[in-house]
Amino acid sequence: MAKKIVALVGDGIGPEIMEAGLEVLEALAEKTGFDYEIDRRPFGGADIDAAGPPLPDETLKASREADAILLAAIGSPQYDGAAVRPEQGLMALRKELNLYANIRPVKIFDSLKYLSPLKPERISGVDFVVVRELTGEIYFGDHILEERKARDINDYSYEEVERIIRKAFEIARNRRKIVTSIDKQNVLATSKLWRKVAEEVAQDFPDVTLEHQLVDSAAMLMITNPAKFDVIVTENLFGDILSDESSVLSGTLGVMPSASHSENGPSLYEPIHGSAPDIAGQGIANPISMILSVAMMLRDSFGRYEDAERIKRAVETSLAAGILTRDIGGQASTKEMTEAIIARL
């Protein structure tokens, strides 16, 4: 039976990079027989422009019924500070689908090491994953703004913490078997709970080493010794900051994918970069983050590990051959980059 994939096209460069990702998927499917169907939908600013909410009911329904969801990019300067913004649609989708676990792999391509702001010896061997809790904590707590006072409620349950830490251990089992749990337990009650739960979950994974780091120390280590990390797991706010810090290690956002997983429903796959409205429509956007997000989808949602590796190898060999878009020092267009990757599948 054909797998159902919802493609949320989004704003800015979203349509261009989504098309690139789907072209790679189509080329791969022709070689491997992967059977799927695509349900393309606008999302974010495009929905608001049509005088609708940023997450229409029909889009939510289609997403719930899908086997996987691809999202290109959302956001537009015209909505900065507006009461209704594209980002609200994404937050609502995460909450409605219970996309509690954000997975962001951080790996430096050998051919792109020169882009990193760190010295080559600092980034040698960097290959880790940030696992961020995505639907709880301060982002989804009560926000109270008074004239001369404000409060944001930071709230976690045992169950919310347990499931994200367990997810990190499951990922680590197939890697170097090291989990670094990041908190602020010397100050925050939620972090004291976090550390307690981490210790308890670790008992179920005797083959995996658990380490603890305070968030300020972890932020420094990510710059001074990033290769020490294997799997990082942390709460929503800390994960938001640290995952963005980790993206700087590669020197470009254009080659980094991400996934957001639920417990039972479909997962969502997206690049980590924004909608780049300044270059939208010019055909120069880097499609690699989107293409690698497709690879993550094939691996995580459909168990097609070799297909995912074929895409990753095609990306790596294309970069090594010097085929680079402008953001990473070359002149290749979106189409040329995509065609180079397809040719190497």
Question: What do the PLM-derived regions correspond to, one by one?
Answer:
Residues 44, 111, 213-220:
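Short acidic loop-to-helix transition motifs that present clustered carboxylates
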Residues 6-23, 27-28, 147-216, 228:
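Glycine-rich phosphate/diphosphate-binding loop of Rossmann-like nucleotide-binding domains
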Residues 33-57, 222:
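N-terminal beta-loop-helix "entrance" segment that forms/cooperates
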Residues 11-14, 67, 131, 168, ...:
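Buried hydrophobic positions in well-ordered alpha/beta secondary-structure cores of metabolic enzymes
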Residues 21, 25, 198, 290-301, ...:
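Buried hydrophobic packing segments
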Residues 49-154, 237:
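N-terminal glycine-rich phosphate/adenylate-binding segment common to multiple enzyme folds
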Residues 45-48, 114, 222-323:
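Glycine-rich phosphate/nucleotide-binding loop
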Residues 135, 139-181, 185-187, 205, ...:
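Glycine-rich phosphate/pyrophosphate-binding loop and the adjoining helix
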